[in-house]
């Protein structure tokens, strides 16, 4: 039991923080690991830059909002986010110029390509090099936050819809979510099924939480919005109250092919 508990804790740490996507009414979160991997890939394209670490969290002293739906356990509330990055740079170009490009790249990609409400990027230079390193794979938080083999296997497995214990309503909603364009597959993280359904009586209603991966060519926030709409509509069957849906994105391959999306920091 102790080993299983330790493994569960490690898997949770691998995911990092659960970051809000969009605004309070979007009901969507993304794992810090997925966001960091995406930002690390685009930062690697900046000449002379090698990321050493990259973290994303709530911006200090900034207001937060109450989400419109129940968030995943331990998820950050909707609000402004900040990026913290440590990097090494080449002296081939002026350091301020390199830092400005890295900052604008990280902020722009986080906001436009992912849907994160990032407002600042704090950078720290850890080393300066005379010449650019050749043939070296950029070291980013993608490697620093690499999942354990067991966690990776769970997140890389095929969709579990229609198999095992996925029965009845849960199976139906899983099929609905998996069928939304842009959903690469449903994922099992945080020690739970890809789709969780909970009915409550006071007030009457139903809450669904969906964990998924976003495929290439699709914007994470747009996909999540479509999933929430489709699942909420399907989940109203045989329930006396409304259905609310929260989405957690655990992986995204949506990079360089997606179009920007509007991120709302206040309710619509």
What is the predicted function of each stretch?
Residues 16-71, 161-196, 267:
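N-proximal, solvent-exposed amphipathic alpha-helical segments enriched in charged/polar residues
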Residues 46-88, 122-132, 184-215, 243-257:
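Short edge beta-strands and adjacent turn/loop segments
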Residues 78-138:
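Extended, hydrophobic interaction surfaces within ordered domains
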Residues 215, 225-237, 254, 258-268:
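Extended, charged low-complexity segments
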